[in-house]
Amino acid sequence: MKRIHYFDLLRCTCFCFIIFYHLLFQLYLSGICPVERLNPLFSNSNMHLATLGVAVFFMLSGASLSYTAKENFSLSKYYKKRFLRILIPFYILYIVYFLFLLFQSHSVHNIFPEGIPAWRIVFTFLGMDSWVSMHGISTFSLTIGEWFLGCLILLYLIFPLLRFFMIKSEKFFFIIATGIYLTVLFHYDFSVPIHMNFFLKGYEFVIGMMIGYYHEKFNPKWIFLSLPVVIFFVLCPFALPISTGLKITILAVAFWISAACLEPVLEKGNGRFLRTISNYSYEVFLVHHIIIYFITPRAIPYMRGMVGVLGLFLVELLLMAVLGFLLKFISDQCIAALSNLTAVENKR
């Protein structure tokens, strides 16, 4: 199947947005810089760099799955591949980070709140502990993958069902999905922030599914419509009188189309750089928050203005690259071993 180059571009861009935001926001949490000075670097009254990155990534996840599942879709192979690709790196990092925290604190009670029922470890096995914690339920979360991973795993679990209904009737499927989206959007009654809501993230996922299955390519002329929308959201001096959730969706779709229109240009290059970053993006995403959370507060004594901040970012990015590479290497070895073991068992 032909590789869609702008998928790589979007994946790299999304994770850069998310990591950049976390790098900056940790400066505030560590008392290095007031949030008022940082906010203009990643947000305004109409957009937020991290929420844009997350929204586009949910679209990208749906698009990638539906695009690769156009032909010879196997339910068992799908779940096996998703499980190995997502949960193996999560398990490895969770174990290593837990042992690291245990070595530091000398007690499990200093890592997790007391009184958590033992059965809730199942949320960790599913990779959904941080997402469940976001809803006020105590779990054994170490914040690896944050709420993002659990929400995405839920959508991966129901993807075959969504795909079935999408193929049955594209228009009816989209109308129902849009109806649910608008109902949730304009009658919002959830405790979680709107940009983290499962139904709104699910709608972005569905938009991506439909793009990946039916319309993965766009006429380059569409950029003359989409790019002005993106620029307007970034530069608009006043708050648009519409729902925050709607702003996120409109901007994410416009940003997607703008990137998609670059496909003819991207096809002319070899794409190795984007492809490499894209291949390691998930592992870097898993490790990045741990690195930022651990390194930034300890760098305070060495901060010397902007030069110190840039040096800190450089060190953290380098550590992300190294640890992300190691995590992927170890994960790939484990996945290969498990796949070989399964193949041997099937031959018996």
Regions picked out by a protein language model, each given a short descriptive name:
Residues 16-23, 128-132, 177-189, 228-241, ...:
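Aromatic-anchored segments of alpha-helical transmembrane domains
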Residues 5-69, 86-94, 325:
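Functionally critical transmembrane alpha-helices in membrane proteins and complexes, commonly lining
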